[in-house]
Amino acid sequence: MEFTTAMLGASLISTTSTQSKHNLVNNCCCSSSTSESSMPASCACTKCGCKTCKC
C-alpha cells in the first residue's frame, strides 16, 4: 500500500512540473524584433498573435 501511495505522489509531482512548464511557454511575451530567426522554437507565438516573441 505504501508503494502505491509513493507512486501516486511522484505522478502528481510530475504532472505539476509539466503544467508549469506549459504555462511558461504560453506566457511568452511579444518581441519588438521582427527577425523570425531569433524566435525560440518553444515559444507559442501563434497563441498570442505575434510573429516573434521572447521567453
From Swiss-Prot:
A GO BP annotation: cellular detoxification
GO molecular function: copper ion binding
UniProt KW Lyase keyword: no
Keywords assigned: Copper, Metal-binding, Metal-thiolate cluster
Superkingdom of the organism of origin: Eukaryota
Family matches, as InterPro entries: Metalthion_11
Family: Belongs to the metallothionein superfamily. Type 11 family.
Name of this chain's protein: Metallothionein-3
Gene that produces this protein: MTP3
